[in-house]
């Protein structure tokens, strides 16, 4: 599995700001969008382009356009919605596929409860977004579902990943690519990433 920890100074700075314990909902939400945007820039750097001719201001002109890449953005509810707009800033025509999975606080196992996927998802590259890759259970369950529907190409975008989650994801889905702004130290006994960001969903939505 390809794992890319994006070490651009802007990303590192913004993730550092997100670690503040008393950060406001507004600021956390803004930063989640901004880092999601920067991760998208990195994750799409290998998209192929082709030459096409358009009508320019002074007649025909040859330009580069992305070649035949249909994209669907897949936010994992609910926290993944906080990164979605950052992706759409770069790919505004992307279709949106929504997957609802929550983590049982007792067992830490993923529990699917909803999905609404783009048509022809088997022909699309899926950019799956979720702020935290902790145990990896929710991400693995999401990829299981997408593969069942015929999707073959995946790029995973997360703000923070734990080594345990990376290992679990690689074991279950070695064919995907993971892009993260930070690889943190470990999980605690409750399955939270240390040092992490806290509960990203609560911070994005202003709930507890």
From Swiss-Prot:
Record EC number: 2.4.2.9
Activity regulation comment: Allosterically activated by GTP.
Pfam families: UPRTase (PF14681)
Residue numbers binding 5-phospho-alpha-D-ribose 1-diphosphate: 78, 103, 130-138, 199
Cofactor binding notes: Binds 1 Mg(2+) ion per subunit. The magnesium is bound as Mg-PRPP.
Needed co-factor(s): Mg(2+)
Any single biological process term in GO: uracil salvage
This protein's UniProt keywords: Allosteric enzyme, Glycosyltransferase, GTP-binding, Magnesium, Nucleotide-binding, Transferase
Enzyme class label: transferase
Pathway field: Pyrimidine metabolism; UMP biosynthesis via salvage pathway; UMP from uracil: step 1/1
Binding site for uracil: 193, 198-200
Reactions this protein catalyses: UMP + diphosphate = 5-phospho-alpha-D-ribose 1-diphosphate + uracil
Recorded GO MF terms: GTP binding; magnesium ion binding; uracil phosphoribosyltransferase activity
InterPro entries cross-referenced by the UniProt entry: PRibTrfase_dom, PRTase-like, Upp_B, UPRTase/APRTase, Ura_phspho_trans
Function: Catalyzes the conversion of uracil and 5-phospho-alpha-D-ribose 1-diphosphate (PRPP) to UMP and diphosphate.
Name used for this protein in its record: Uracil phosphoribosyltransferase
Species of origin: Aliivibrio salmonicida (strain LFI1238) (Vibrio salmonicida (strain LFI1238))
């Amino acid at each position: 599995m390809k794992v890319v920890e994006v070490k651009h100074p802007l990303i590192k700075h913004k993730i550092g700001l997100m670690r503040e314990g008393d950060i406001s909902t507004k600021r956390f939400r803004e930063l989640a969008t901004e880092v999601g945007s920067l991760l998208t820039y990195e994750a799409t750097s290998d998209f192929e382009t082709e030459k096409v001719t358009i009508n320019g201001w002074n007649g025909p002109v040859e330009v580069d356009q992305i070649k035949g890449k249909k994209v669907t953005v897949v936010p994992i509810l609910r926290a993944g919605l906080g990164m979605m707009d950052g992706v759409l800033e770069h790919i505004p025509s992307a279709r949106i596929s929504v997957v609802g999975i929550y983590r049982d606080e007792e067992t830490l196992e993923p529990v699917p409860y909803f999905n609404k996927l783009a048509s022809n998802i088997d022909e699309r590259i899926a950019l799956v977004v979720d702020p935290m890759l902790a145990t990896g259970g929710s991400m693995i369950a999401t990829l299981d579902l997408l593969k069942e529907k015929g999707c073959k190409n995946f790029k995973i975008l997360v703000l923070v990943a734990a080594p345990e989650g990376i290992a679990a994801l690689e074991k279950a889905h070695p064919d995907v690519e993971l892009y993260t702004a930070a690889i943190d130290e470990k999980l605690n006994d409750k399955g939270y990433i240390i040092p992490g960001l806290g509960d990203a969903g609560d911070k994005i939505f202003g709930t507890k």
